[in-house]
Each structure stands twice: as C-alpha cells, then as structure tokens.
Regions:
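Small-residue-enriched alpha-helical segments and adjacent helix-cap loops
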Residues: 2-13, 33-179, 209, 279-406
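Short, flexible, solvent-exposed loop/turn segments with mixed acidic/basic and small polar residues
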Residues: 25-30, 62-68, 221-224, 268-274, ...
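Intrinsic, low-complexity N-terminal interaction/targeting segments
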Residues: 12-30, 96-103, 266-267
Length: 451
C-alpha cells in the first residue's frame, strides 16, 4: 500500500518529458491525449482499490477500458492535462502510485501471482515491499541510464520471467530452508537477449545487497549516450560475462560493508488456497463493471485476485467450488474465464511508437484460432516488443512494407520457440514478413505443425 505522502500526485503536468515519464505519463499518438500508468505494488490490489479504479475509469476515461500491462501495471488512456492531476490525487487517496511506473528508474517489481498461495510456495509480499523501499532510497535511482526491472518468482516454474529482467530472483523452499537463485542482465527490445545465471544457493538475506549492487553497476557503467544500448544487458555485453560478474561481486562486497537493512523473513504459509480460474482479459482491457465484479468477488468470497504478466488475473480461494460458481454465474466474469493465450500491446490504438494495429490481429486470432494449444501467442506493434514477442512460443513483431504500387502494408515478422522468460530460450525467426490479414491462417498452420 502506498500512502498519500509517498504517491506524489502532481498539481500540474510537468513540462519536462523526463519528469512526465517518472510520474507514469506518456503522450499518446492522438494529439493532446495522455496515458497514465499506475503500479500494482507487490502484484496485489484490494477490493477497495478495484472498486476505486472502476469509479475513476467511469469519471475520467469513460470511453476506454482499464488496461492491464505485461508488468503488473494498470493504464488509463485518453486523459488530458486537466484531468491528470485530478486522477493522480484520486490514485493517491486509494493508496496507489504512478511514481516510477515509466522513466529511467526502478520500475514496478513484478511478482508471480501464486506466491504464498500455490502449495508450498513462499510469501514474497513483505520482502518485495521492503526491497522496493530500500532501493528507492538510492541517490541515483531516478536518473539511471535506462529503466531497471526486477522480478520475483516463488518456485522453479519462474512465472515472473527472470530471464528477461535486469534482475530476477527465483525463491524456493527446499526441505525446511528457503534458497534463492539470481538471474540477470536480460531484456527485450529490438535486439533482445535473455540473461545469465548470476548466483545459486543464495539466502534471502543476500537479496538487498545484490539488488543494490546491480543498480550501482548499472548507474556507473550504463551507456547514457545511446538509449538503444543503455540497459544492464548492454553493460554485460560490453564487458563480457566474466568481467560483468566480477564488477557485480565487487560492488556487492561494498554494499555489504555499508550494512544494508535487514529484510523481513520469508515464510511459507499454510493457507490451503486453491487455484480457481484465470480471467483472460482481451486486449488487457477491463470495463469498470468487470473491475467492480472482481472487487465483489474478493470481498464476498475471500478470493485472492492476482494480476499476472500476461493480461490475465489468477484467482485463488480456500473454498474453490464456491468461488468458481461465483465466477460462472456472473456474466461479467464468466466471459473472461477462458480463451486462447493471446496477448497484444496497445499498438496503433494508443501508442505513438506502434507501426501496426495489434488489437485487430488479436481479435482475428481469437475468432479464427480459439485454441492455441496452451501456447503463448504474443503480438507486438513494433520492434520494442512490449508484448514479449521475442520469447513467445509464437511471436508477432510489427513491421511495415510497401507493395508494388507504393502503398503501406501492415504485417509482422514471425518468431517461434521462445521460453516466455521462464527459461533462457529466445524465439527464432520463421518468417520475415507476413501481412496482417494472412496471420490467422499462418498461426493455425504453425500451431498444427509445430506444437
């Protein structure tokens, strides 16, 4: 939970683009309209917050849905400079913040939705909140060379995708002990690469020093002149893996000499929660009515509703049968309870960087390919790969070509075989360019022939 004193709502929209981004603001492709990103701290929203978000969407952006992102954030679209300060004040009142949701800083720390709920998994909420507070106290945290992303997974399934984060912690219970594996220096973008194993058999007490060391190495050696080569991964590539790990270890020793704060203990609760369902959010967009239905489900049936990083919301409950019945008997939720594993970025609907209409392709796939055989199909509107296409089972990356008459044709590079960031596997190119209207048939064929 974020207090009103630490949410920092703005009184006016800053004139500096960098300051806007630090407040989670981006200008849309539509002139005069803005996107506001909001962090879901610890991957958790209370029923009060779901209800408050529904109310805010009705009042501030009634014509657009509440958009989930692939990093446990929420986005408002079609805001104006007049409505942004009002919205940020409402967010702060609800215990939500947009500070650090965008920009060259520590982004939202993502957490696998099943932590502390799936059988025999540690509860990571307390350590994630404490680590966030510790790292945000670093003097250079809001002026890093580029964004810095951290994730936490609660078992070896690595649902929080450590291999595509700047730093990913995989926390697991082994007998009576909790051990940690650290993976780092991976990222997507136009030239994506997964990370490397940093260290195994760490203790939870090692986490703050390693995380602080990684940020300091990034701050010292990150390329501030070339944004396309400014992630921690590029530091590793310039130095080589061996020297990069040496720099990290040296900085880690220095941080330990400063005696970083002790983190809360990681416990493995015996809560007996069961997985109820995954709500499959088309385009990542929820209506206010659906958000209110989720709030009621949490409040009335003691359900834990945890956003994933794949436009889905995982539902857990002690009384799974009653919760499942509540989902199936509510038309607003039942329509979200199944569907193919297809995720698209906002594309040309909102994003100024997008090349193609991703939502149209997602809609076509959901209609024409209703069964993706449990394979992840990811649709990105440009080479930045915000939909994580570069590590998908089947990824589409937006491109533009011209036909013989010189007309612009929207289409995609097609890649296959990725590990979705849960492993080091990158997707590999299978088709250089396929026009948008031919994508559904191609996806059908690839799913039939490959998986």
């Amino acid at each position: 939970m974020t207090s009103q004193q630490t949410a920092f709502p703005c009184a006016i929209v800053p004139s500096s683009p960098a300051e806007c981004r630090l407040l989670g603001l981006y200008q849309q492709r539509q002139e005069g309209l803005w996107m506001q990103r909001v962090k879901i701290i610890g991957g958790i929203l209370t029923h009060h917050q779901w209800a408050a978000l529904a109310d805010m969407f009705r009042r501030f952006t009634p014509s657009t849905p509440l958009l989930l992102t692939t990093r446990q954030d929420i986005e408002f679209h079609n805001l104006t400079t007049e409505t942004i300060p009002l919205l940020q004040a409402e967010l702060a009142h609800a215990g939500l913040t947009s500070v650090g949701a965008c920009g060259d800083t520590l982004r939202n720390i993502t957490v696998c939705p099943g932590n502390g709920l799936c059988h025999d998994t540690p509860d990571l909420t307390a350590i994630v909140l404490a680590l966030r507070g510790y790292l945000e106290s670093y003097v250079g945290i809001y002026s890093l060379p580029r964004k810095f992303k951290i994730s936490f997974s609660a078992c070896t399934k690595a649902c929080a995708q450590p291999w595509i984060n700047d730093l990913g912690f995989v926390v697991q219970r082994e007998n009576s002990a909790v051990t940690v594996t650290a993976i780092g220096a991976g990222s997507l973008g136009p030239r994506p690469a997964t990370g490397i194993l940093i260290e195994e058999n760490l203790t939870p007490e090692d986490i703050p020093a390693l995380a602080q060391a990684a940020i300091r190495v990034f701050d010292k050696y990150g390329d501030r002149q070339h944004r396309a080569k400014a992630r921690l991964r590029h530091v590793r590539e310039r130095c080589g893996d061996e020297r990069f790990l040496e720099l990290l270890h040296e900085e880690q020793l220095e941080v330990k000499r400063e005696a970083p704060p002790q983190m809360p203990p990681i416990s493995v609760p015996d809560l007996h929660y069961n997985h109820v369902a995954d709500l499959n959010i088309i385009y990542g967009g929820l209506t206010p009515d659906q958000a209110e239905a989720i709030a009621a489900l949490i409040h009335n049936h003691a359900v834990k509703a945890r956003p994933q990083t794949h436009h889905r919301i995982s539902l857990f409950a002690r009384n799974a049968a009653a919760a499942r019945n509540a989902v199936q008997t509510n038309p607003l939720l039942k329509q979200l309870a199944d569907g193919p594993d297809v995720v698209s970025c906002p594309g040309t609907t909102y994003c100024a960087h997008a090349l193609v209409n991703t939502h149209a392709v997602e809609k076509a796939l959901r209609l024409q390919v209703p069964d993706t055989k449990n394979r992840a199909v990811r649709i990105s509107g440009c080479p930045n790969m915000c939909a994580q296409s570069g590590v998908a089972d089947l990824g589409l990356i937006g491109r533009i070509r011209k036909d013989e008459a010189g007309n612009r044709v929207e289409g995609f590079m097609v890649v296959t075989g990725g590990g979705m960031g849960t492993t080091a596997a990158m997707a590999e190119k299978s088709h250089d360019f396929v026009s948008s209207e031919k994508i559904p048939e191609l996806v059908k064929n690839i799913l039939h022939e490959t998986f």
